Curated annotation (Swiss-Prot):
<keyword id="KW-0963">Cytoplasm</keyword>
<dbReference type="InterPro" id="IPR002314">
    <property type="entry name" value="aa-tRNA-synt_IIb"/>
</dbReference>
<comment type="subunit">
    <text>Homodimer.</text>
</comment>
<dbReference type="InterPro" id="IPR033730">
    <property type="entry name" value="ProRS_core_prok"/>
</dbReference>
<keyword id="KW-0547">Nucleotide-binding</keyword>
<dbReference type="InterPro" id="IPR044140">
    <property type="entry name" value="ProRS_anticodon_short"/>
</dbReference>
<dbReference type="InterPro" id="IPR023717">
    <property type="entry name" value="Pro-tRNA-Synthase_IIa_type1"/>
</dbReference>
<dbReference type="GO" id="GO:0006433">
    <property type="term" value="P:prolyl-tRNA aminoacylation"/>
</dbReference>
<dbReference type="GO" id="GO:0016740">
    <property type="term" value="F:transferase activity"/>
</dbReference>
<dbReference type="InterPro" id="IPR007214">
    <property type="entry name" value="YbaK/aa-tRNA-synth-assoc-dom"/>
</dbReference>
<comment type="function">
    <text>Catalyzes the attachment of proline to tRNA(Pro) in a two-step reaction: proline is first activated by ATP to form Pro-AMP and then transferred to the acceptor end of tRNA(Pro). As ProRS can inadvertently accommodate and process non-cognate amino acids such as alanine and cysteine, to avoid such errors it has two additional distinct editing activities against alanine. One activity is designated as 'pretransfer' editing and involves the tRNA(Pro)-independent hydrolysis of activated Ala-AMP.</text>
</comment>
<dbReference type="InterPro" id="IPR006195">
    <property type="entry name" value="aa-tRNA-synth_II"/>
</dbReference>
<dbReference type="InterPro" id="IPR002316">
    <property type="entry name" value="Pro-tRNA-ligase_IIa"/>
</dbReference>
<dbReference type="InterPro" id="IPR045864">
    <property type="entry name" value="aa-tRNA-synth_II/BPL/LPL"/>
</dbReference>
<comment type="similarity">
    <text>Belongs to the class-II aminoacyl-tRNA synthetase family. ProS type 1 subfamily.</text>
</comment>
<dbReference type="Pfam" id="PF03129">
    <property type="entry name" value="HGTP_anticodon"/>
</dbReference>
<dbReference type="GO" id="GO:0005829">
    <property type="term" value="C:cytosol"/>
</dbReference>
């Protein structure tokens, strides 16, 4: 392809709305343009990268025995009402009515549609096991689209579903998909962790996320270098110190005028934050919940939601009027002792192992010290509701945990019979008995994978594409297109590489060499061939985008050299 004919309107300035490298570079390198908040148009280079990633996904899914289909993006409400998810998704699902006032949605995910297909078409054990997948645009009305395609309202996803006769079969399908995902992300040139995760609104269990380590990732990951344990923040656990050596002391009320936060208490009492227990008052649907965690910890609301069995939008911190009603005190002095009315107390599993901690007294300007669980108060539920922190002990081996940020690019989990029960997807076994089909679900965000690749493969000059997903493998840059010898050699190399089936660009624009080099670096094409002054000596330069140094190569050797580089890097 000739660069003079390619729609590639690169930008010199950083777009105002772009916050992270992938968003900045996808706009600067003309991979995409913004149409609306969270909605993007892909230009030719961006579309080529998307197709490269999709091709890798297709090859590995097919290799794993999966079959590609294509479902409708428009889903009738009846299907989601059968599963109970029409209301579960809440405002993030795009809902609409047709001209006959029938309810539909733009698919945020497709469990029900796949299950509906299978309940109608699969009747016998002879038709199982089965894995189906599609690559299709999904829609979610994100409250706050940000970071470009990292959190957008329209995105391309590969979603696959396995259908098995029993749990043993699901285990085999799950492992096939796990291995396929590892191959996909390896081929995309990504460094990633596979972490334990929460299934969220999708349901199911044995949930794993494929996380690309990146400082701009929205997910927090806890992992252990010693044993390989890894989990996202919503699922991460740690060992609790079981050894209690401190004797219980008599509890004592302490005057703490206008001292409301943990930080203020630390300064006022001169005690470290891990000796405090904070009581957070929540409104959970129509109930009030007091959730207790150690003073230096954050409460994990996903863990709390799972315990309560409610949706995210049904949980919120209580307002001042509710806090004052159940505690009898102003905000900032809540504690577990003497709460008024029907309040469900949920205590983090670390607290029963603490001694002589400090809590709010449920009296304005007062706290209580030397409080102990069991003696002074009890909970309705004791469970893990905290976020782990750096240095916590690994739940498997006891080594210190590390904390990092990651971008979720893939998610696999075992659905079991959640949807087959709800929609009646059954098969008849060898004995003639009717049984529910056992399902698994497997997703990859295609756009997000592209962004994650850029996050891990860029420098101050631009993108550094891995060979496997680069829009073109080679860019030829004649330094001076007006120079007949340079132009002729550049065109000859261009034709020779095309003949070999190599994806090649030629920068035939009549621009300064510096501008061309800058664009080549910005676009991230893996191999640059510079045709310059040494062309009369039969020499050109080959430079890899990932390296600083260029190598002089005989013109007669260029094609073979390029073929070898591509073979090595693919």
């Amino acid at each position: 392809m000739r660069l003079s004919q390619l729609l590639v309107p690169t930008l010199r300035e950083i777009p105002a709305e772009a916050e992270i490298p992938s968003h900045i570079l996808m706009l600067k390198a003309a991979l995409m343009r913004k149409l609306a908040s969270g909605v993007y148009i892909y230009l030719p280079l961006g579309q080529r990268v998307l197709r490269k990633v999709e091709q890798i996904v297709r090859e590995e899914m097919d290799r794993a025995g999966s079959q590609e289909v294509l479902m409708s993006a428009l889903i009738p409400a009846e299907l989601l009402k059968e599963s109970g998810r029409w209301d579960v998704f809440g405002p993030e699902m795009f809902k609409l009515k047709d001209r006959n006032e029938r309810d539909f949605c733009l698919g945020p995910t497709h469990e029900e549609v796949f299950t509906d297909l299978i309940r109608n078409e699969v009747k016998s054990y002879r038709q199982l096991p089965l894995i189906l997948y599609q690559i299709q645009t999904k829609f979610r009305d994100e409250r706050r689209p940000r970071f470009g395609v990292m959190r957008s309202r329209e995105f391309i996803m590969k979603d696959a579903y396995s259908f098995d006769m029993d749990w043993e079969g699901l285990d085999k399908s799950f492992n096939k998909m796990y291995e396929a995902y590892c191959r996909i992300f390896d081929r995309c040139g990504l460094k990633y962790l596979v972490v334990e995760a929460d299934s969220g609104a999708m349901g199911g269990k044995d949930s794993k996320e494929f996380m690309v380590i990146s400082g701009v990732g929205e997910a927090v990951i806890a992992y252990c270098d010693n044993c390989g344990y890894a989990a996202n923040e919503e699922k991460a656990e740690c060992l609790i110190n079981q050894e209690i050596v401190e004797e219980m002391l008599p509890k004592e009320e302490v005057y703490t005028p206008n001292v409301r936060t943990i930080e203020e208490l630390v300064n006022f009492l001169g005690i470290t934050p891990n000796k405090f227990v904070k009581t957070l008052i929540y409104k959970a649907k129509d109930n009030v919940v007091a959730a207790l965690v150690r003073g230096d910890r954050d409460l994990n609301e996903t863990k709390l939601l799972n315990i309560l069995g409610i949706r995210e939008e049904e949980l919120e911190l209580a307002d001042a009027s509710i806090v004052e009603k159940v505690t009898g005190a102003k905000v900032g002095f809540a504690g577990p002792i003497g709460l008024k009315g029907e309040v469900m107390i949920i205590v983090d599993n670390e607290i029963p192992q603490m001694r002589n901690f400090i809590v709010g007294a449920n009296e304005t300007d007062y706290h209580i010290k030397n409080v102990n669980y069991g003696r002074d108060f009890k909970a309705d539920v004791v469970a893990d509701i905290k976020n782990v922190i750096e240095g916590d002990k690994c739940p498997r081996c006891g080594s210190p945990l590390k904390i990092d940020r990651g971008i979720e690019v893939g998610h696999i989990f075992k659905l079991g019979t959640k949807y087959s029960d709800a929609l009646g997807a059954k098969y008849v076994d060898e004995e003639g008995n009717e049984k529910p089909i056992i399902m698994g679900c497997y997703g990859i965000g295609i756009n997000r994978t592209v962004a994650a690749i850029i996050e891990q493969h860029h420098d101050e000059k631009g993108i550094i594409w891995p060979m496997s997903v680069a829009p073109y493998h080679v860019i030829i840059v004649p330094v001076n297109v007006s120079n007949e010898a340079q132009n002729r050699v550049a065109e000859d190399i261009y034709a020779a590489l095309q003949k070999e089936g190599i994806e090649v660009l030629i920068d035939d624009r009549d621009l300064r060499a510096g501008v061309k080099f800058n664009d080549a670096d910005l676009l991230g094409i893996p191999i640059r061939i510079t045709v310059g002054k040494k062309v009369d000596d039969g020499i050109v330069e080959i430079k890899l985008r990932e390296n600083e140094e260029a190598e002089e190569v005989k013109i007669s050797d260029v094609v073979e050299k390029v073929k070898n580089i591509i073979k090595e890097k693919m």
